[in-house]
Amino acid sequence: KFELPPANDNMRRVFAYLLNRRGIDKDVLYAFVHKKMIYESAQYHNVVFLGFDKDGIPHHANKRGTSSSSTYKGNAVGSVPEYSFHWNGKSDRLYLFEAPIDMLSFISLYHKSLAFSAESGKGGYTAGNLPDCTKFGRCTWRDHSYAAACSVSDKVLFQCLHDNSNIRNVSICFDSDEPGQLAA
């Protein structure tokens, strides 16, 4: 049975770890925290990355140690891999990663080039490669979809495709090691 790790009463260690040690952009991090997708566990002060179904019910919790001496990574007992940590956007783009940190790092590094303005024609796209959200005039990183498999599984990918019929373009952003390349 899936149970969420109890939350700590503050997120000091999580903010220090993600902002200072991992270099996650504060606006990107705050967007996920605001949606209650990231929190700090009470017992071990791990960062917890939550995955929800389309009705907003949590079904997956990936945990990552935050202390400088910790290499702990794992999923909470009963986590359903189809609903691992992900962000649903409205564009036709999905970026799939192995780990939540990889996903947040990518968004932090590229959030400006993931934006597109139909008026200026600027952004990380070429003429024949425009995202669906440009019909609304402007895209930001929030308009795209992102998922972290919390492994090299394809289960969250197929769940995202099932839940988001607008997705037409998938970028697999797995590590360049043997497991990542075999899965890709």
Where are these regions (language model features)?
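Replication-associated primase and helicase/ATPase modules
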Residues: 1-9, 13-19, 121-124, 131-138, ...
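TOPRIM metal-binding catalytic domain and adjacent DNA-binding surface shared by DnaG-type primases
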Residues: 1-47
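Phosphate-handling DNA/RNA-contact segment within nucleic-acid enzymes
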Residues: 39-121, 126-163
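Acidic beta-strand-to-loop metal/phosphate-binding motif
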Residues: 96, 168-177
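Acidic, metal-coordinating catalytic cores used for nucleic-acid/nucleotide bond scission
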Residues: 150-154, 174-183
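Short, aromatic/basic amphipathic alpha-helical patches
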Residues: 160-161, 182-184
